[in-house]
Amino acid sequence: MTEKKGRGRPKGSPNKPKMELITKREKLPANADVYEILCQANIVAAENFDFAVNGLKHFGSRNGAVKLTLQWLFSPSINSTLPEGKTPYTTNIHPASDLAETSLRFEHKMFKYFVTEQVPMTRRESMWIEMLEGIPAKESEMIDLVKDGTNPFPNIDSRLAVAAFPDMEV
């Protein structure tokens, strides 16, 4: 048996990003999806904390899924009842988020079933996969990471989330 040679990432190299994020700052439409809002907040938070808080407040008032996504990510009292790891699902093929069948903006009402035991496990998992297949590809990739407690946004932390949504339990 041959031994594996250590040809992984070189020492000192940056960690591999958890997912590909938007890196260009742009003006968001009024009906922006959660992924776009959090990517822009991530960019702005690196420059100015207060502007990021105001942006999250502004878009969080229009899209209820922003607050619930951040709460699921940062609240220690919320534990996912879904299996850990990458979910096997078929990625939505629509090129733009506004062409997808649905969005987290509408599907966030189902989050309560993924963190409680109200629904049998098989039904809960099928609901999760159906939701991931219906929402835009980047949103489904993001929420699949959030389910496991992995923060894909390096500049968004619990301090920023609480500043934007003071009634959030973190």
Task: For each feature predicted by the language model, list its residue ranges.
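N-terminal nucleic-acid-engaging modules of covalent nucleotidyltransferase systems
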Residues: 2-170
